[in-house]
């Protein structure tokens, strides 16, 4: 367990994202345990989180801009990710998709013909999920950070996974490359490979850990963003999950018992990668 007499100073990158904002809120609510900072890439995103001094603006493609945010931190949670955007169609109008962000319309419960996707200039998976994450890992190591929690994705065992075909971005391939880089970095780490994300309430499902995408073909291959956020926060304090990597899914709501004991959950994880 972390030293309970000292607050952990934690930087969360991607703090204004759908999952990142949930994790940021959870950390802020536990001010007895954590001093939290957020890293975002624009003033608009900073204002979205309240605009306080604890919100830093940085560019993950430029390591020098990351150093002020990482000065003096104990831990880093990486929740940055390239975002595939949806091309408008008759079924999904531009108004519906709010500028084309796929996550606002399509989540793990979506079924139907998959529309076309693209990535914004400079925001391709290679740039964000590989180079951007590598820059964060390198800077954190340089600054003496003691623990990095990286949120990845299930599906990395299958090069032909449909997510890789979105915008021809090979997103899972680049994510897995960053995961391996972190595991080899020498910095204590926790890699959480989340299943299909949905926006339902957290704290109501039984969470499951596994490896090698075994949960993906089943109804247990999905998870609420709020539960991923909670797992990130819990991983900061549970020693047993350091230098471990695992898939994270959940049973359907109403099946099993809601997970409350994260130490018991994480004790099931045995794989370093």
Curated annotation (Swiss-Prot):
Active site: 153 (proton donor)
Activity-regulation annotation: Inhibited by iodoacetamide and irreversibly by its product, dihydrosanguinarine.
Noted pH dependence of activity: Optimum pH is 6.5-7.5.
EC primary class: oxidoreductase
Binding site for substrate: 157-161, 175
GO CC annotations, alphabetized: chloroplast
One Pfam family, short name: NAD_binding_10
InterPro entries the UniProt entry points to: NAD(P)-bd_dom, NAD(P)-bd_dom_sf, SARED1-like
Gene Ontology biological process terms, A to Z: response to toxic substance
EC number, UniProt record: 1.3.1.107
Keywords: Detoxification, NAD, NADP, Oxidoreductase
GO molecular function: oxidoreductase activity
Reactions catalysed according to its record: dihydrosanguinarine + NADP(+) = sanguinarine + NADPH; dihydrosanguinarine + NAD(+) = sanguinarine + NADH; dihydrochelirubine + NAD(+) = chelirubine + NADH; dihydrochelirubine + NADP(+) = chelirubine + NADPH
Function: Catalyzes the reduction of benzophenanthridines, preferentially sanguinarine, to the corresponding dihydroalkaloids. Involved in detoxifying the phytoalexins produced by plant itself. The sanguinarine produced by intact cells upon elicitation, after excretion and binding to cell wall elements, is rapidly reabsorbed and reduced to the less toxic dihydrosanguinarine. Can work with both NAD(P) or NAD as a hydrogen donor, but at low concentrations, the reaction velocity with NAD(P)H is threefold higher than with NADH. However, chelerythrine shows maximum conversion rates with NADH.
PANTHER family linked to this entry: NITROGEN METABOLIC REGULATION PROTEIN NMR-RELATED, OS05G0110300 PROTEIN
Subunit organization: Monomer.
Protein family per UniProt: Belongs to the NAD(P)-dependent epimerase/dehydratase family.
UniProt-recorded name of the protein: Sanguinarine reductase
